[in-house]
RNA sequence: GGGGCUGUAGCUCAGCCGGAUAGAGCGACGGUUUCCUAAACCGUAGGUCGUGGGUUCGAGUCCCGCCAGCCCCGCCA
């Protein structure tokens, strides 16, 4: 309906110009043209759209809002293009103008979407690269629940942007550099030197244990700390022994990460922190040239504007430590320059999106400010932190295992699939259905992972997220199983003889449930546009849930296969477009669908 | 101390550029199956939108104060 909304907006503006020529001209001169405030109708009984602009004009025009609305409507009715599109507008309440699109126009919109891969979503015209930076686990650690949201949300946002036609660079900014490596390598040199020059000498689980030990020593032992720092400097200086050890550790971790990504069907290009190593000195030079750099306590800093620390002094972003080493702020700045920079040493991006937890908001705000002041953000480019809240257990505290450890992502996914399998088996039992082992594994795997993804995505990402297997796997409510079931129902119609591919001429609808479904289906383009702009996947989830509800109502109350000969093709067309929209929408959430479950 | 986020029904949460009587789901209670998968559908009950001011024709939404919870605050990422 975006095209129709756009057309209506223009028609409304023209009508306002004709109704109030002097005020319209004056408003345009003040570069605040009269706004019809066109919005989707807040309730179905108000039609398809509402224009609230008359209310705002009451004061400047010194007229009653309903009188203003009447004048605008009179002008609209004089416009043949408008009367061709809409029924007679209704003025309601204090002065709302309610607009209802002609049924035949809605039916024509549905027709146009049948068989359209894009489902009415326009492709972007100017396609500049978009960077989505997400997931970002640390080398030598296992992926855990802390990586869940970034990975799932980032992937979904990338999919939506790709669907709109943007060239998307999915970057995995893995933690493969810095102090942590100094600690690990120093520790391994002492306790497991094999791991540093032989591939797979220890497995990843051991490596994680070594890492934990190293971290403990680092925190407790000053001498170890110093050696570790020296090790980092060696690594950053390109010492061959350190580099080889580092390479082996990275390979090993990378393979483990890939297993998770394969399982979740997530595509990512690894470009870790180390990638930006050669560009770090230029960051310092650049900041020096921009006269932003200040030496403080031996460290190179940029002091932030508008952000005060404990003592009321401006807060610094440290870009070079007193020992000469660089840190994450330096890397992030180098990454910003690279991503906005021109090829070959740059990505030429116009939008860069970071999907990381909300706890890093201060860090990014600081880094973005420095980049801005250094002039590294091109005119019109967008640099956005997409924050999300913590994953909490049902007790409202940070999610932990019963033993109090961090939950491994692998275990979390396993449990979701296991629970889905248990549910499925007991259901099959109850219904006295018999299915192959292959069917059970496939359905349980799909439903389990879909549930994990959907539960996360369906929540506004800003707030903390309460993780609950029971809720996400529930068969009713705003859950993946409920949505998947709607798709299964349509597949059932196709199996039972409904030819969804049949092409019909004129679509015709008679039942309110059909019209409700038509109107819901036509909202898809606006929802995608909104997610692209706001980067909130939960908006897409809400839409798909509502679409499923409207479809289930239709399915329950209106016969499809047993419909009259005249109604049948149109109803099959609705089923087809619903299935396509649900599959496409779920696909943008990274969730595959099933024909039977 | 400074900064950020959050506070909406018993629970988990939506709420779009400020717009009409604040919405879902779960849970509770009641109903629906000779018919395309009842994993569904229909209905009932449930609200001082943390709180006090302000702006506005109109505030859950914007501004200011306060309260509560979570997170961050110099050489980890």
UniProtKB/Swiss-Prot annotation:
Presence of the UniProt keyword Chloroplast in the record: no
Disordered: annotated span: 23-43
Motif ('HIGH' region): 137-147
Catalytic activity field: tRNA(Arg) + L-arginine + ATP = L-arginyl-tRNA(Arg) + AMP + diphosphate
Identification of the protein by name: Arginine--tRNA ligase
Domain of life per record: Bacteria
Name of the gene encoding the protein in the UniProt record: argS
A GO CC term assigned to this protein in UniProt: cytoplasm
């Amino acid at each position: 309906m975006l095209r129709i909304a756009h057309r209506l907006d223009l028609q409304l503006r023209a009508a306002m110009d004709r109704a109030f020529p002097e005020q319209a001209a004056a408003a345009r001169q003040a570069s605040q043209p009269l706004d019809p405030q066109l919005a989707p109708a807040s309730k179905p009984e108000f039609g398809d759209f509402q224009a609230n602009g008359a209310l705002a004009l009451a004061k400047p025009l010194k007229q009653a809002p309903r009188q203003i609305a009447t004048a605008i409507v009179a002008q609209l009715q004089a416009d043949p293009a408008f009367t061709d599109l809409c029924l007679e507008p209704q003025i309601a309440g204090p002065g709302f103008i309610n607009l209802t699109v002609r049924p035949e126009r809605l039916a024509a919109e549905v027709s146009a979407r049948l068989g359209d891969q894009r489902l009415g979503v326009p492709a972007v015209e100017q396609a500049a690269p978009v960077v989505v930076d997400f997931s970002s686990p640390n080398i030598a650690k296992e992926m855990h629940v802390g990586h869940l949201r970034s990975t799932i949300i980032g992937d979904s946002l990338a999919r939506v942007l790709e669907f709109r036609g943007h060239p998307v660079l999915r970057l995995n900014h893995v933690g493969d550099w810095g102090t942590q490596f100094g600690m690990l390598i120093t520790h391994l040199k002492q306790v497991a030197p094999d791991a540093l020059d032989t591939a797979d000498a220890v497995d990843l689980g051991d490596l994680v244990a070594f890492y934990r030990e190293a971290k403990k020593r680092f925190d407790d032992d000053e001498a170890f700390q110093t050696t570790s720092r020296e090790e980092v400097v060696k690594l950053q200086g390109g010492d061959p022994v350190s580099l080889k050890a580092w390479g082996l550790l990275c390979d090993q971790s990378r393979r483990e990460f890939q297993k998770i990504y394969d399982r979740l069907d997530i595509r990512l290009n690894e470009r870790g922190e180390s990638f930006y190593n050669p560009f770090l000195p230029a960051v310092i030079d650049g900041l020096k040239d921009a006269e932003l750099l200040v030496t403080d306590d031996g460290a190179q800093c940029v002091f932030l504007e508008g952000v005060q620390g404990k003592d009321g002094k401006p807060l610094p972003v440290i870009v070079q430590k007193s020992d000469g080493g660089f840190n994450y702020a330096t890397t992030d700045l180098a990454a910003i320059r690279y991503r906005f920079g021109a090829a070959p040493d740059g990505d030429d991006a116009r939008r860069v999106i970071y999907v990381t937890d909300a706890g890093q908001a201060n860090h990014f705000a600081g880094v973005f400010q420095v980049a801005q002041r250094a002039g590294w953000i091109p005119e019109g480019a967008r640099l956005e932190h997409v924050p999300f809240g913590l994953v909490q257990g049902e007790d409202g505290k940070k999610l932990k295992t019963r033993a109090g450890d961090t939950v491994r992502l692998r275990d979390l996914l396993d449990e979701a699939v296991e629970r889905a399998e248990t549910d499925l088996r007991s259901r099959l039992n109850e219904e006295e259905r018999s299915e192959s082992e292959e069917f059970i594994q496939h359905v349980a795997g799909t439903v389990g992972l879909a549930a994990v993804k959907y539960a996360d995505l369906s929540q506004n990402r800003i707030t903390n997220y309460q993780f609950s297997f029971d809720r996400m796997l529930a068969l009713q409510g705003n859950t993946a199983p409920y949505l998947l079931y709607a798709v299964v129902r349509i597949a059932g119609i196709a199996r039972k003889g409904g030819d969804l591919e049949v092409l019909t001429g004129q679509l015709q609808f008679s039942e309110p449930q059909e019209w409700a479904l038509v109107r819901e289906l036509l909202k898809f383009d606006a929802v995608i546009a909104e997610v692209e702009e706001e980067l909130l996947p939960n908006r897409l989830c809400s839409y798909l849930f509502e679409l499923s509800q409207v479809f289930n109502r239709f399915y329950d109350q209106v016969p499809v296969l047993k419909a009259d000969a005249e109604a049948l093709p149109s109803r099959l067309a609705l089923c087809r477009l619903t299935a396509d929209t649900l599959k496409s929408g779920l696909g943008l959430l990274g969730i595959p669908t099933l024909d039977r479950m």
